[in-house]
């Protein structure tokens, strides 16, 4: 198979030490002793959108197939949404819907918002992004760092509810005469971006040899634009939908029936309605993928192939792997690395988050030690010694986002607890106490419960506004707080 190579258009002269040979894009040193393909130099970050490389995944079981991924995470905004954002804004400018200094408003799971923030920053627009509250903290912080106004709304309501994120964005734009509501779910430029850029790139990179394309539906632009392009050139190319369990789309494709929407944690794909730009007739089959499988496959992708990708990529890859393993003849299968996984480090790449949400099973004891979020014997918790300065203790509590820490002596026995109220009292009493040791401010009265205690034994501890120290004569096992008990009871529902 021919693999396309070459420099992007607009590359600048890199100096006299190298020269470009013919039009191959390969640069040679003057003495011809070494070769290198150099990336071009751009004058604006928006010029870097598109023309992303492809990678063949070699370490997964793909049956008789070959599986390629388009590395859309390498766009400057770290996602495939850069493509649609620049196309939709260009179209709005040309039509006069967006004027200089205007306001861009969009409902997004985050990546479209980040792409729009990139463009707004370069072109001088204001940006308001409305997001469901299940999205990662990294996305929210990233958007705000780029100057966007972020409005969080409920993720547990469907279209038509006054707090549904798309309806809120539309209302905000309607009330501001200078605002342009992007509305990626109904914007034809969304489809155009993939039909004119993403799909042709893949077609050229794989020399037109594509038997199946696997994608998810967030707004519908990817499936509609790329699916149409591939079907026009190869009617036998199968368009495969990767859909989270809880979305209404997979049942609609496979069973031709409409189901009530559920909930899912994967971000960016799956829907509780059919976006108007989505051409369902292009989809040949669908796979419904659980959150657990999506997260597991995304984590495997990092371990096996070194690709740090987002949660929706786990869904796409899980579906692609199922498709590949079902085949009896060799096929070329393509899917997407939609975004970079750095935005999910606090979620699916965080073992504690995975445990809290039931996606990783820890060894169990069958007693209240199973309620401990961070186990001391496994070095998961954060502790202090009595001599640590109070300023250092405050720094650690902030760094680790904890409200209390156990204070241990040299024998690993709990001699006290330092919590937020202790710190507050210390600062109120003496503003110059930063160098004073923790022992001067910690609570020496600790509520110790044995591992054999019952859940009911924890209630008096919490009523006394204390934290439970789980320990016996041999070991300190960890702390149990109110939220730990709440999480435990939540999992029993």
Regions found by a protein language model. Name each.
Residues 282, 366-382, 388, 435-446:
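Bateman (tandem CBS) regulatory domains
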